[in-house]
Amino acid sequence: MKLKGFLAVGVSVFGFSGLLMACSVVSQFDQVDDGKIKLASSLTSKRAAEALETVVKKYNDTKDPGDYPIEIVQIAGGYDGGKKDVQTKVSTKDKNNFYNLILNYPEIVSTLSRSKMALNFDGVNVDKLHPNFLSFNSRIGGIRDDGIYAIPISMSTDLMVINGPVLHYILNSARKEGTPTSTTVQATVSSRSAEKKGTLEIANDSETTKLWQNIQTTAQNNSNETTKEQKQVKRSSSSSSTTSTTGETKDTTKSDNKIKEFWGEYQEVDGGLKNFTFKASIFENWNETLDFATRIANSFPEKVKNITNKTGLDLQGVLGVDSSSNALYAAVFAAGQANYDNFFFNIDKRTGYADYSNFLNKDSSYQNLESVYNDFYKLIQANGLFVNRGGSYSSNFEKFHQLAFSVSSSGGYSYYFAKDNAKRLKFSNYAIEYPSFTQTIQAPNSSETESNLLGTFKLSEKDINLYKGSIPSGKQQGVDAILISNPNLINILEQAKQKNTAQGSESTTNKIIGYTTTANVNVDNQNIFSVSKLNNEQFQRKIIVNATEETLDQSQTLQSNESIVLPMPGKYKSTDKNKVMITQGPNLIGIHANEKENIETKKFVNWFLNQSITDWNSNNQQKNSDQTTKTAAEYFTDQASYILPLKEKFNKSSDLELKGSSSSSNLTTSSASASLLISNNSSTASSPAPKKTNNNSNTFTAKALELFQQAANNEIIPFSDPSDFRNGTFRNNISSSFNAAVNSKVSFNQFVQNFINSLGSGFRR
């Protein structure tokens, strides 16, 4: 029942050929009753995978003797790999190797329903879940009978994450001398900042005043050399600035000077921040956010606008967007007044499947996409937009001050911030933060006689040797040895080994020639290589070479108390009537098997959602975690830093509390004592994220909870894709077409033509 880690792919793995496969409808079939319930998973998070394993073990240990056990089936290729696997098993009527449940997105239900293989969770008690987050089941194509076919158990949304010190330097450089600031901050911030030469003004409304005050606070934190001693402060809707320990400097000069090394000199130019008025409301809609980002790019030509061929060590732009499709979908949906009839596609009640005619016939969604794209296009032309391509997330760069702000998943908190005096591995044209679960590889010294020994690393006080060719007798693959087969990696390690040997036999310290890790780093087969796992490892082992290790000063990196976390822009333009939010995440989806297994599947799902258990920590989890009674669903989402849409969590009259466990850097929302009080006010002037402490406050989850609460109370409209067997291809192709346009800088007409061509004729049916 061990899980492997697989990197979720961001581009459709099946494309048009998979679309044709999906169009081939087969009749319902029964699976062979093998006496177990198989749960298919493509989880990539180590904590989520371990939590799921714990849940399954708990069920198997406590179920009634006659109940079927649960078995986890790992699917390669991420969520797209899971979609492809379901299509294959349905089309081939795989009766022996199919599964009963899968963690994936609702479009799989549409694929299953075409062959009557979707399992209706009738009889499962979903009363604990808020109906606003179950209603998407009515927007799944192909469903013949109303019901619950997909259950959201790991929800997230997208957030705006501002690098406070970077934005402070930008605004402080551009603002007019004597621009009003809040009385509190003006009294405490040193006036030794660089001489003002700009004409930017900061609006004096209350929301902007609070936001500017928080931006200044983050710059103070970045200047502060005593950050490790800073006390965490509980915050409420009335709090306006952080409290610091005695001796903490209130000067922002050090921070500004450090950021200036990255961003260069501010230039007062037309089309930039010249004569601009900064307002908090800028971040509430895409139109103004993109205009602001474009003005910043134009104001820093030496480091942003004029840099066309960026390396990973350069500024990546002003705004980072981790999911292009989410950004486009949210903006177009908001521009269409949050009405699914004005979106790219919606489920046609007559046919039961998605109708793409609104877009393909150039109706409202096409026109809104043109407006949205043209706003992005100005930023693209100024080289100010960074988009995620295949796992290169904004967090990788914003934490090193290479972006000013970004839109990213609320599940990404643990990736966004560097530790004090963080280390990173620097290559010739990019760098990565020093990964967790990493060991150094030493070259053999001249006294070691094995000619095919490439290097050694130590794991739990045990030496693990790396060999080429073959493993000598007395050593065992996966136990104390790993055989290296990649010729490029062998060559790099060989050269380092020979260089070390040339130092002479008197050398007593083995040279570090590389690093090895089981963390989730991108394999490129140039600097980072995938190798065999050790026998007891769940996740793929990698070897990192050609890297220089460097330790960074705190002011060179983003800490959690230097960020400002806001909602993703909820409108396209400020005049839009409704605010929207993205709701996303894999669902628990049932698959028809046979009468007995269907009953056993629903029995497990009902237990998962409703059975309260106290002793979760007895199963290889944190010793210091709380013992609060919770269901398996609550435990899973808490451990994975996601949100379970429980009615009680979204009770309008109750306070939302941010909580966390105490012994992991992958932070969670759990039932421990509160470490931060979250305001019900989702205004732009959000407080900076507090300094990470032993309570590990997860401000991303806190902000997401605020938004989900508003959606539950109909104060904001949650968007989720109408689900059809084709919508995954549509989403992936609009994302890849947009990302390509960021490079090529093509006009809207060329972008949209490339996108439509990529869809093929199957979308006009």
Curated annotation (Swiss-Prot):
The keyword Amino-acid biosynthesis does not apply. A lipid is attached at residue 23 (S-diacylglycerol cysteine). Residues 1-22 form the signal peptide. Residues 179-192 have a biased composition (Polar residues). It is a lipid-anchor. Residues 177-203, 218-255 are annotated as: Disordered. Disulfide bonds: none annotated. PROSITE patterns: PROKAR_LIPOPROTEIN. Residues 236-247 have a biased composition (Low complexity). It comes from the Bacteria. Keywords: Cell membrane, Lipoprotein, Membrane, Palmitate, Signal. One of its GO terms (cellular component) is plasma membrane. It is found in: Cell membrane. A lipid is attached at residue 23 (N-palmitoyl cysteine). Belongs to the MG185/MG260 family. NCBIfam families: lipo_P68. This is Uncharacterized lipoprotein MG260. It comes from Mycoplasma genitalium (strain ATCC 33530 / DSM 19775 / NCTC 10195 / G37). The lineage of its organism: Bacteria, Bacillati, Mycoplasmatota, Mycoplasmoidales, Mycoplasmoidaceae.
